[in-house]
């Protein structure tokens, strides 16, 4: 166990369960120390033979130390010199990079690269002897050179690294007065050991190992690739050239200007000069891929690069790219600003995708689609990520946020417009409604925690910058844009976007710049309204009384939380455009935060007495709505009689609001659970998907409750049974119906419906005998077939299928299947594979841990493995890794015992440096404490309702 004696003693003195806690911890520690810690049963994790797609990179422990590249002298060594302004986190505003000439030479098999950068710098207003710019890990190999624009050499007195702020500092012998200068630096770095900066990975092709090297620079990793002024408002132009071996090609942001054969081995590829770009958007790749090409309606070449043996899987991406690209050029009334657009699927990629200008990089699962191997959900994911990254070519690339505190200007906008982009290509996918279940409703949960943060938030370290790449910046950002568009009208919103883009073309902008554009086109007080949504965390719940009076208060999941904490300049009051509907009448009434007594909706006089006033029509507002208990009961009756009185969005919203309100103590669980009775008649994907998610919280809390969980399963199993039986375990060409089938069959299996589990096991055995499965049923069969009937033979068979699979989406499904086995020995074997990068790529480690944690047998094992191997994970990924930062909250979402809370607190005390995971740790602690209190407060209420349901005709 990874617990120090002194902290053990301190915690063992706290609670009333001290003997139980300490005894269990000691026992678990001994078991894990002998089992997991020593790598029990690792026979499945021997390095495999080379095959089509298995990585052969060495495990991290065998890689060279990137801070000490061999074979070259190192200049500008790190010094603890704090006698200068380079101790500040931000670069000075009087230094401006104008142009970079960047040359790189990667040696693919040696996994090293060398480079040289010449930077044209404009110094304004201030005289100084010092220049400093960003550099991390990569080493300077010659003394930097500095000269004036006229060519006069300026002697360098010294240079040194200042590691706390990731700077290299150059001190000149003489004063540098406001003028133009040139700075030249040579450097060397390693291509291995990381998925950020300039790195390489491998793949298999016809039994041979192949290399590809590419970049991933957002948010603060360009400084790992080359010395640069690595802040988003330090835009400059670039001329990039790459010397590479003859049998490789190089691509970058801009088209190739020319290639030069240097000798029998090396070729130099020179790219055209770029437009002004932020450093995080600079990109290049050295590869042996092929491409699928489409031409936009305006003649722009659009290419999708993939491994030669997978190039057929790039066809769908190419088709989507053309349609969505043309759509956004038309919508924004602005041409794409570069001569070409490339996309490339990287075999090992740390994030989902990266919007580099003119060269978008992707994880393979998010770009490549095979109709014979990929599910409908995979197809939608590919289309959505493509659309998201295309939006960035305008929002983010042409106009970039001035600083990372306005990250949402990039990510919130891309997350909003991606649904419009996909809808342009796939009109039958209900994408404009799916934003509810993909973004709005999920982030309502995240933003109802005290540990949330405002959309615009101060960040002052790389870790803090990384941490704001979260649901608040992406999904809440998208959701409030949806609300804004509905309020000021789609026409004004579109005109405002066009105005914003044109006024800040090739520049940086702040949130107020966007509000200004929207105000000018709409004539409405956009800033006054929207500041209450971006400059304070959280959101309101609107209480509607029987007189149609609406009042607001901050919504928090924890009933005991202080709604005034942390302090807010708006005192947690919001300016709200309230959209409502009754009968055929729909309108928007504005709720000003200063109206302390609330507002009253004037209802139509010609409606029947039993008509229903729907507040937050289409769930377009970023808030929840609570009605009087008798109104909720009336709503249940209406839904039972004819749920189609309300549209898809409203039905999904009712369910989500009801269960969130009950969890927060604002609605009785009996009323929320009564509403679910209508689901026996529901036949649409979006309401079912959200119902399953809303119900899952109770399921997670009760899963280990042997007395109560079977009752929960019987009730909800009876609700899902009709539609599961109707849809059957069959193939279907209809996209939405396929998503619905997957949702309800998965839920039926979780409720342990005998028919559903029997079908999963039957299909699993057929698959074991060599019969192919329908692509939309595979994940269900892999998971529940393995769970219900999997043994060691089946697990080994699936593991071999995983090793030989070529499509990344199929490999990911098989990983989930492997993690679903109800066998501790096999799960332990799977965990032992994590450190073998020949078997599990770096990008998939957190996926595997997450899948194992979803297994009732594996959730404790995954948590224990992470605690035992934390130092290994930190060394492999660094504390700045956003996926590592989110890992604890991902694994601990269902924790609901004092022991689990104690383990978490102890772990955080032992490893206090959270890096990019600081906010995630706070969320994990808050959620676990809330779960413990929830069981104390509501278990009996839910138990009573379930007991009564078994003696009634509810279902």
From Swiss-Prot:
Transmembrane segments: 18-38
Main enzyme class: hydrolase
Entry's Gene Ontology molecular function annotations: glutamyl aminopeptidase activity; metalloaminopeptidase activity; peptide binding; zinc ion binding
Activity regulation statement: Substrate specificity is modulated by calcium which enhances the enzymatic activity for cleavage of acidic residues while reducing its activity with neutral and basic residues. Hydrolytic activity is inhibited by the aminopeptidase inhibitor (Leu and acidic inhibitor) amastatin, but not by bestatin (aminopeptidase inhibitor Leu inhibitor), leupeptin, pepstatin A and PMSF. Its hydrolytic activity is also strongly reduced by zinc ions, with a complete inhibition at 0.5 mM, and moderately inhibited by cobalt and copper ions.
UniProt KW keywords: Aminopeptidase, Calcium, Cell membrane, Disulfide bond, Glycoprotein, Hydrolase, Membrane, Metal-binding, Metalloprotease, Protease, Signal-anchor, Transmembrane, Transmembrane helix, Zinc
PROSITE patterns to which the protein is assigned, alphabetical: ZINC_PROTEASE
Chain residues that bind Zn(2+): 388, 392, 411
Parts of the chain on the Cytoplasmic side: 1-17
The keyword Nucleotide-binding is annotated on this UniProt entry: no
GO annotation, cellular component aspect: cytoplasm; extracellular space; plasma membrane
Residues that bind substrate: 218, 352-356, 882
Residue stretches in coiled coil: none
Membrane topology (UniProt): Single-pass type II membrane protein
Cell inner membrane as UniProt keyword: no
Family indicated by similarity: Belongs to the peptidase M1 family.
Functional description taken from the UniProt entry: Venom protein that cleaves N-terminal acidic residues from peptides with high potency in presence of calcium. It may have several roles in venom including alteration of blood pressure by cleaving circulating angiotensin-2, general degradation of host tissue, increase of permeability to other venom components, and/or processing of other toxins in the venom.
PANTHER family per record: GLUTAMYL AMINOPEPTIDASE, PROTEASE M1 ZINC METALLOPROTEASE
Protein name per UniProt: Glutamyl aminopeptidase
Species assigned in the record: Bitis rhinoceros
Lineage, opening ranks: Eukaryota, Metazoa, Chordata, Craniata, Vertebrata
């Amino acid at each position: 166990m990874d617990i120090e004696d002194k902290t053990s003693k301190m915690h063992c003195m706290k609670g009333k369960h001290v003997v139980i806690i300490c005894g269990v911890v000691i026992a678990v520690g001994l078991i894990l120390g002998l089992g997991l810690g020593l790598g029990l049963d690792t026979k499945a994790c021997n390095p495999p033979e080379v095959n089509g797609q298995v990585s052969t990179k060495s495990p991290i422990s065998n890689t060279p130390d990137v801070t000490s590249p061999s074979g070259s002298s190192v200049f500008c060594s790190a010094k603890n010199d704090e006698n200068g302004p380079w101790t500040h986190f931000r670069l000075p505003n009087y230094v401006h990079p104008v142009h970079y000439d960047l040359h790189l030479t990667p040696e693919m098999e040696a996994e090293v690269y060398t480079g040289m950068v010449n930077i044209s710098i404009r110094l304004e207003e201030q005289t100084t002897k010092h220049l400093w710019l960003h550099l991390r890990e990569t080493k300077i190999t010659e003394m930097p050179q500095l000269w004036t624009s006229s060519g006069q050499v300026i002697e360098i007195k010294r240079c040194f690294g200042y590691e706390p702020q990731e700077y290299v500092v150059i001190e000149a012998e003489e004063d540098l007065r406001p003028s133009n200068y040139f700075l030249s630096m040579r450097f060397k770095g390693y291509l291995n050991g990381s998925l950020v900066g300039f790195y390489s990975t491998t793949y298999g092709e016809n039994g041979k190992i192949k290399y590809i090297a590419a970049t991933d620079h957002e948010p603060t990793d360009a400084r790992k690739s080359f010395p640069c002024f690595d802040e988003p408002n330090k835009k400059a132009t670039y001329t990039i050239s790459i010397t590479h071996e003859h049998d490789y090609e190089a691509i970058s942001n801009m088209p190739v200007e020319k290639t030069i054969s240097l000798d029998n081995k090396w070729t130099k590829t020179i790219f055209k000069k770029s437009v002004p770009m932020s450093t995080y958007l600079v990109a290049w790749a050295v590869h042996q891929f092929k491409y699928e090409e489409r031409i936009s309606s305006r003649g722009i070449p659009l290419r999708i690069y993939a491994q030669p043996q997978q190039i057929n899987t790039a066809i769908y991406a190419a088709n989507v790219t053309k349609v969505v690209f043309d759509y956004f050029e038309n919508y924004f009334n602005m041409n794409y600003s570069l001569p070409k657009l490339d996309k490339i699927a990287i075999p090992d990629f740390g994030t989902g995708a990266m919007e580099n200008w003119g060269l978008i990089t992707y994880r393979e699962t998010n770009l490549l689609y095979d109709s014979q191997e990929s599910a409908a959900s995979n197809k939608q994911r590919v289309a959505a990520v493509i659309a998201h990254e295309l939006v960035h070519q305008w929002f983010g690339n042409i106009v970039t946020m001035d600083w990372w505190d306005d990250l949402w200007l990039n990510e919130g906008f891309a997350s909003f417009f991606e649904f419009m982009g996909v809808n342009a290509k796939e009109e039958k996918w209900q994408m404009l409604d799916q934003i509810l279940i993909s973004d709005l409703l999920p982030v309502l949960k995240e933003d109802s925690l005290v540990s949330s943060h405002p959309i615009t938030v101060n960040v002052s370290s790389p870790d803090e910058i990384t941490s704001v790449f979260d649901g608040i910046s992406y999904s809440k950002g998208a959701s409030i844009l949806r609300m804004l568009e509905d309020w000021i009208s789609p026409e004004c919103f579109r005109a405002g976007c066009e105005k914003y883009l044109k006024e800040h073309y090739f520049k940086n902008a702040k949130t107020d710049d966007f509000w200004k554009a929207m105000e000018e086109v709409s004539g409405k007080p956009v800033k006054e309204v929207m500041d209450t949504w971006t400059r304070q965390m959280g959101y309101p719940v609107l209480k509607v009384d029987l007189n149609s009076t609406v009042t607001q208060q901050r919504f928090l999941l924890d009933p005991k939380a202080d709604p005034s904490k942390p302090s807010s300049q708006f005192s947690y009051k919001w300016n709200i455009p309230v959209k409502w509907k009754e009968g055929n009448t729909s309108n928007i009434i504005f709720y000003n935060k200063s109206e302390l007594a609330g507002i009253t909706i004037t209802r139509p006089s010609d409606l029947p007495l039993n008509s229903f006033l729907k507040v937050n029509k289409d769930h377009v507002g970023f808030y929840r709505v609570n009605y009087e208990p008798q109104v909720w009961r009336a709503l249940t009756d209406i839904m039972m009689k004819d749920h189609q009185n309300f549209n898809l969005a409203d039905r999904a919203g009712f369910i989500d609001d009801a269960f969130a309100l009950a969890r927060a103590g604002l609605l009785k669980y009996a009323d929320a659970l009564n509403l679910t009775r209508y689901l026996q008649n529901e036949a649409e994907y979006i309401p079912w998907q959200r119902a399953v998610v809303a119900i899952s919280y109770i399921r997670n809390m009760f899963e280990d409750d042997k007395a109560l969980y079977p009752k929960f399963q019987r009730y909800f199993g009876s609700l899902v049974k009709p539609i599961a039986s109707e849809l059957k375990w069959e193939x279907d060409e209809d996209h939405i119906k396929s998503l619905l089938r997957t949702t309800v069959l998965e839920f039926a299996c979780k409720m342990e419906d005998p028919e559903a589990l029997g079908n999963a096991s039957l299909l699993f055995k057929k698959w074991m005998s060599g019969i192919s499965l329908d692509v939309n049923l595979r994940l269900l069969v892999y998971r529940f077939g393995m769970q219900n009937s999997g043994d060691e033979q089946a697990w080994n068979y699936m593991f071999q299928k995983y090793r030989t699979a070529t499509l990344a989406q199929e490999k990911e499904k098989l990983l989930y299947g492997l993690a679903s086995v109800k066998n501790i020995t096999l799960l332990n074997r799977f965990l032992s594979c994590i450190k073998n990068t020949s078997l599990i790529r770096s990008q998939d480690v957190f996926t595997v841990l997450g899948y194992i944690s979803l297994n009732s047998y594996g959730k404790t094992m995954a948590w224990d493995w992470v605690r035992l191997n934390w130092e290994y994970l930190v060394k492999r990924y660094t504390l700045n890794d956003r996926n590592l930062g989110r890992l604890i909250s991902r694994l601990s979402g269902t924790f609901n015992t004092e022991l689990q809370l104690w383990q978490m607190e102890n772990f955080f005390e032992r490893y206090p440096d959270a890096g990019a995971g600081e906010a995630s740790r706070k969320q994990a602690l808050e959620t676990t404490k809330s779960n413990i209190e929830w069981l104390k407060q509501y278990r009996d209420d839910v138990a009573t309702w379930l007991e009564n349901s078994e003696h009634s005709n509810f279902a």
